[in-house]
Amino acid sequence: MAKRIIYNEQARRALEKGIDILTESVAVTLGPKGRNVVLEKKFGAPQIINDGVTIAKEIELEDHIENTGVSLIRQAASKTNDAAGDGTTTATVLAHAMVKAGLRNVAAGANAISLKRGIDQAAVFLVSKIEENAKPITDNNSIAQVGAISAGNDDEVGKMIADAMEKVGKEGVISLEEGKSMTTELEVTEGMRFDKGYISPYFATDTDRMEAVLEEPYILLTDKKIGLVQDLVPVLEAIARTGKPLLIIAEDIEKEALATLVVNRLRGVLNVAAVKAPGFGDRRKAMLEDMAVLTAGQLITEDAGLKIENAKIEMLGTARRITINKDTTTIVAEGNEVAVKARCEQIRKQMDETESTYDKEKLQERLAKLAGGVAVVKVGAATETEMKDKKLRLEDAINATKAAVEEGIVPGGGTTLAHLAPALTEWANQNLSGEELIGANIVAQALDAPLKRIAENAGANGSVVAENVRHKPFSEGFNAASNEYVDMLAAGIIDPAKVTRSGLQNAASIAGMVLTTECIVVDLPEKKEAAPAGGGMGGGMGGDFDY
């Protein structure tokens, strides 16, 4: 296919155009008075959302080069989402501000590599400053505040997440599912999560989120490799008759068997997913036995004289719901409390008896997984459109609270970054020179961008607000919900330090990449050839036939 090649300024300008378009559509959602964005869906009702990364994923431009700019800045949002689960809009706005200022300097003759070096050093300095200023989270109230802000200032959601964390512990699993009523409810049930995702992405049932969700599935647990699909046939046939989904957790599934499962899944013959068993050696077996207890099934192992080809449907475990993504599997079970408690007691006894610290640690891990349970938040809403929006907000809120527990909190509302700008300028003037200093100053100017945007979305003058905040103490900032200057920590307007840090690092990384771009190679759009006119029957046959 023919390519189009663009160099220098023209290349960077084309990228900038795409970045502008994406940032504008995402930035309108920033802050407590941010607006919503409506996404058209090919099938079903349009989606009304307020989530930066979801909007970014939807944007595709006609112009290939501008689309490359969109993809670059989308990466800043996705990487922040992967690392911290929230703060995607802030990362996008920051990256945009850095790119704009950087391109002006490159156009004026500055060396892009030196600018990038300055930007990178500024990012390292700021990360250390954010860590310095982060306050650890100690009480439930702070957790509720972080959750409420991430869910779009919804105090009820914040409180619910704080309750969930209290019940299942800071490391516990909080799962989301669609409720049957108008209200959002919380329940704690038996369950566990382990760090293995699906073996093949073709098992995903929700391709937008790349997740496999199995409702009331059967679970086949085995500690051996599944090599031949013939071994599985009796079980698969029995399950196909019940019409229920199946999850296979095995040491491994080899190519032939995996291909057969995928084909059956894609053809709709059987809703099946497969996951590798977690752990190694004896620990793997013990964890599989834990899962067997949790799901009221049997571990099919040759030690017990059981073979997969002879497995009956009664030997399989069951669960209420299983969610699998590329990295983790969450099992929500119910109705097995007695067996789970007995198993936990058994693990505690083993912990008392063992001398090895390593074994104790691993047993403690297993106990936490089994005893902690899963907090299930059932999302309630009046319409499906509202349900989807609520689910995205809740997901952000859960991720943000976990990030806050990990690395602490900082003043929110763009305040932290704005307050760090003078410190960065001072440090850069002392430690950097020439074009590296210009690079660091680009970052210092960009740090005001999220605060300005939050203020503008609330109808205030962004530049005036940023200037006012700069002269106030570190924890004071602009409360866009009430249009006044307050102590952000006292008012509960807080951000997880991890979210602020990830957003900044990813924005600086993308900005550096865009500034050092000197050439773009993209596909030339294919010219659609005009169809020949099929006039009359002249010259024999009509022009509409393909001979």
UniProtKB/Swiss-Prot annotation:
Keyword Aminoacyl-tRNA synthetase: no
Catalytic activity: ATP + H2O + a folded polypeptide = ADP + phosphate + an unfolded polypeptide
E.C. no: 5.6.1.7
A Pfam family the protein falls into: Cpn60_TCP1
Keyword entries, A-Z: ATP-binding, Chaperone, Cytoplasm, Isomerase, Nucleotide-binding
GO biological process, one term: protein refolding
Superkingdom assignment: Bacteria
GO terms assigned for molecular function: ATP binding; ATP-dependent protein folding chaperone; isomerase activity; unfolded protein binding
Subcellular location: Cytoplasm
PANTHER family with a match to the protein in the record: 60 KDA HEAT SHOCK PROTEIN, MITOCHONDRIAL
Cited NCBIfam families: GroEL, PRK00013.1, PRK12849.1, PRK12850.1, PRK12851.1
Assembly mode: Forms a cylinder of 14 subunits composed of two heptameric rings stacked back-to-back. Interacts with the co-chaperonin GroES.
Functional summary from the UniProt entry: Together with its co-chaperonin GroES, plays an essential role in assisting protein folding. The GroEL-GroES system forms a nano-cage that allows encapsulation of the non-native substrate proteins and provides a physical environment optimized to promote and accelerate protein folding.
Family, similarity comment: Belongs to the chaperonin (HSP60) family.
The name this protein goes by in its record: Chaperonin GroEL
